[in-house]
Amino acid sequence: GASGRNGGWLMGNLLGEDGLLAGLPPERRRAGYDLLHGIPDEVARVLQEEGIDCDYRKGGVLYCAARYPEQERRLRAYLHDLYAEGLDESDYRWLTPQELDQQLRIPGSYGAIHSPHCATIQPARLARGLARAVERLGVRLFEKSRVLH
């Protein structure tokens, strides 16, 4: 299968975002989270505006505690930290094993965090659609160009 960066994930967060935002004042940290969380919706707006069909689907993301109790402890601690930042269940919500089982069957799971701030797209269709959109704006694209420096 494809890696995350090539598999069509359009995430409204960054790995380690809490560390990246930690040095900011609280209101700026919250603004940073809001900016990140808005990424999938902003992309959807551009897709609509430019008429790009790339199989966009905003279904959210699950961070699962699938195998070990320690995974559940880590996820719950992460969720606690997110709530301490002022985020709430509309951003990140704990799913019990029974709730998780309604979406994804993982035998013996310990639960999961669900965030709605994620979508999937078909990357090649997105790239082709964006290329057509910027060409309409007068941008010249050069494919298969040799890099000299």
Predicted regions and their residues:
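Active-site cofactor/substrate anionic-group-binding motifs, chiefly glycine-
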Residues: 1-2
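Glycine-rich active-site loop/strand segments that organize a redox cofactor
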Residues: 5-35
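Extracytoplasmic/periplasmic beta-strand context in beta-sandwich domains
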Residues: 8, 60-62, 145
